[in-house]
């Protein structure tokens, strides 16, 4: 399976001719983005998915600590941000830039590559999605781009090729980064946006082009986006009040779901996909090259569900400035180039990362939605004590 960099560059450049102004006016195309990533010398490639930080400037210290600790302990080859990276309601360009810098500067300092898509909250202010992507592109660590212009309000749909550890010109895996939009502008059904028909057609064309350039052999892949696909309800198992782990009132009646047998993770939160479907999952399913589809959006869910041969995966939120649970954390996804028909993934929570760290645990108690007001008051004073102790321990007499 071999696709040279030269062939891939020509493929990307030709596809860029389809681009228009709304995205391209602000940001780089895929052909201009530095996306040359290889499996490591052990034949592995580890992705760190960070979802729903949803903070501003300044970012909460506890969230920053989570991100730094995750990078230091998990040693990822790529960080993937899956939207609601910031709280977009501030609506000022300087606020957007400084909010994005709060986490992008961390990745820059660690020297870890980053790809990103936006969520429904990122651009709720006056700054467009294209303008935000342009901010990301100012960082050397960013390997994403605005991608092809789809003729609508989305921006940041592209792909990131991964190359063999032994051959820098052999593309053996692909990562689809899809902008799932924000709120429904297509019809009167309300709710969240669905991936558009134009994006789906772009995917089909891009996938066919990559397959042809790869000698007719499809390239295995992942897909990352913010909002889960509507098929999640087909993948889940209907339940009742006693067996359901999540519920919502739909058309005046309570509806319950639970994870199907064999699924991993938890489902405490009722999923929030679009109310309509443009056929995204079917397109990925029909092409048969997608191992897993990874989402954020529903902050408390951590499920992994096999559905029609594709694993649907939700990653919990990483931000303490928005609603959260004891599962707040990140997700690791590890590939081995010797068998690209499967992968390993796990959620790494804040509590996992900082077990035994008294100061970090006090900071968690101070910021977590899971703790009472009294616990937060006690945690504040505990954190002060631990902080003073740490300062004293580091002071050189």
Model-predicted regions and their roles:
Residues 20-33, 395-397:
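Sec-dependent signal peptide cleavage junction
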Residues 56-58, 87-90, 116-128, 183-186, ...:
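Active-site environment of divalent metal-dependent phosphoester hydrolases
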Residues 4-26:
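Sec-dependent N-terminal signal peptides of Gram-positive bacterial secreted proteins and lipoproteins
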Residues 59-62, 83-105, 122-141, 235, ...:
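Metal-dependent catalytic neighborhoods of phosphoester/phosphodiester hydrolases
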Residues 30-34, 99-216:
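Extended active-site neighborhood of metal-dependent phosphoesterases/phosphodiesterases
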Residues 162-163, 175, 271-272, 278-287, ...:
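Binuclear metal-dependent phosphoesterase catalytic core
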Residues 74-78, 174-176, 189-298, 302:
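His/acidic metal-ligating clusters that form di-metal
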Residues 27-98, 102-103:
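N-terminal active-site segment of His-dependent metallophosphoesterases
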